[in-house]
Amino acid sequence: MILLTIFWDTLLDILPIAAIIFGFQYIVIRKRIQRLPQVLAGFFMVWVGLSLFLVGLEQALFPMGELMASQLTNTDFLPAVEQGVQRHWADYYWVYLFAFAIGASTTIAEPSLIAVSIKAGEISGGTINPFMLRIAVALGMAFGITLGTWRIVMGWPLQWFVFAAYCLVIIQTLRSPKSIIPLAFDSGGVTTSTITVPIIAALGLGLAASIPGRSALMDGFGMIALACLFPIITVMGYAQIAQWKDKRKQTTPHLSYSKAPPPSKGDNNAL
């Protein structure tokens, strides 16, 4: 019954998209769609795929994310403290390590990031390395999620972190190569897609529900905002480092080797 409900809800979500596309094609552009059977088959696959993906989220990703957060913050798992003593933020180091690892691994496997990095490499003519771009984005995502978990543990307001991150983004935008800035901002958006968002949301909600004094509504959300910002920072940082290395190679003075002095002539009167 739940499966049928999800299939029906997904169909209702896809129908407006299909109506807009076909409406513009036939009413505004007034041209027939080439290979219409393939297009319809593609829409059918999208419908089935999204429905099964949503089922997988409900059955696996959301429960596992919340379960990992609750297990890593369980008092039996954390270092023992005396009764009445407030737990130190460093006691949750396994939470930070898990957040960093899951953030990096899910980003590397993100289909939208793979597609964008390949396209960026093709358009740039090989100037942008697709794999290094994915690594830079993955590191940014990992740092953002780790910082988000630390914020939940500390209970600090989200706006402080967002303000500081945006200030850093603005400074980097002024000093980064202009060609990389649009790609850096797009990289922050493509990371928060089908794979990463469910795990991040489940981890944040589970962590906020497991730590005493935290609210799932006030503290559980907000990790996705940091996950979007930090890939922008790391991609522009990667571009700045690459630019600095390139300038360093160009300005490195070439060693000039002086010619060896000619051999001295022997004394003619020596013999």
From Swiss-Prot:
Record protein name field: Na(+), Li(+), K(+)/H(+) antiporter subunit B
Region described as Disordered: 252-271
Gene Ontology annotations for the cellular component aspect, listed alphabetically: plasma membrane
Membrane-spanning parts: 2-22, 36-56, 94-114, 130-150, 152-172, 193-213, 216-236
Domain of life, source organism: Bacteria
Family label: Belongs to the UmpA/UmpB family.
Gene: umpB
GO biological process, one term: potassium ion transport
Described function: Part of a two-component antiporter that catalyzes the efflux of Na(+), Li(+) and K(+) in exchange for external protons. Shows a preference for Na(+), followed by K(+) and Li(+).
Molecular function per GO: antiporter activity
Subcellular location: Cell membrane
pH dependence: Optimum pH is 9.0. Exhibits antiport activity at a wide pH range of 6.5 to 9.5.
InterPro entries referenced in this protein's UniProt entry, alphabetically: NaLiK_antip_UmpB, UmpAB
